[in-house]
Amino acid sequence: MSKVIKKRVETSPRPTASSDSLQTCAGVIEYAKSISKSNAKCIEYVTLNASQYANCSSISIKLTDSLSSQMTSTFIMLEGETKLYKNKSKQDRSDGYFLKIKVTAASPMLYQLLEAVYGNIKHKERIPNSLHSLSVETITEKTFKDESIFINKLNGAMVEYVSTGESSILRSIEGELESLSKRERQLAKAIITPVVFYRSGTETKITFALKKLIIDREVVANVIGLSGDSERVSMTENVEEDLARNLGLVDIDDEYDEDSDKEKPIFNV
């Protein structure tokens, strides 16, 4: 097992937003714009349709003609500090795990989706009757929490382990959940798709499902070095064996109890 000390690489400060601003329609749109590296127009318009659930509206995205002609999907790519958690309160359910992504970069699809949805609500167009009473001025927006997006719809997703100069390993995430939950937070990319627009009173959010997680297959651990500084140590000798045996995984609190949140949790969709 190799133990290669890697010095931390200083990165430029990431955009930040106050919790209050992220709970307004204008604030969440501006934040999503700030983490987008492009303003290329992707979305022509969005339609919210009534669903079988009173509080949920399905989301239909119409891409620009140029993107539609290329058969472009409506998936959204994110990048950020990523951690898979066990959900203590739901261990016997299909959503026994969830992904937390502290987003540092996002496709312009994200801000344009938010912009289109709340533009529809503001102008009372392309929305079901159940949303006509909403005002963008009084909505408490919950898509982001602590600058993070939480995803508990993981079924059917794939995980791709990547390493520079080597072939990637692609697997169904169902068989990787336990080992991934034991990893420390690390930078990763995620491809997600919007599921529904959810409303509870004046609280609203767009919920997402994971389609693919792209993560470095090297397992690292944070240790306190001889100098007293925190260092990242590679614990990977053979990637295939490590993935199977969960080597190099540190003992951390890898469980998160949503019920311990002081705020009343918004409906998980």
Curated annotation (Swiss-Prot):
Record GO biological process: chromosome condensation; viral DNA genome replication
InterPro entries: Poxvirus_I3_ssDNA-bd
UniProt GO molecular function: single-stranded DNA binding
Expression induction: Expressed in the early phase of the viral replicative cycle.
Phosphoprotein keyword on record: no
GO cellular component: host cell cytoplasm
Family named by the database record: Belongs to the orthopoxvirus OPG079 family.
Quaternary structure and partners: Homoomultimer (Potential). Interacts with the small subunit of ribonucleotide reductase. Interacts with host FAM111A; this interaction protomtes OPG079 degradation through autophagy.
Function: Plays an essential role in viral DNA replication. Binds to ssDNA with high affinity and localizes to cytoplasmic factories where nascent viral genomes accumulate. May disrupt loops, hairpins and other secondary structures present on ssDNA to reduce and eliminate pausing of viral DNA polymerase at specific sites during elongation.
Protein name per UniProt: Protein OPG079
Organism: Vaccinia virus (strain Western Reserve)
Encoding gene, per UniProt annotation: OPG079
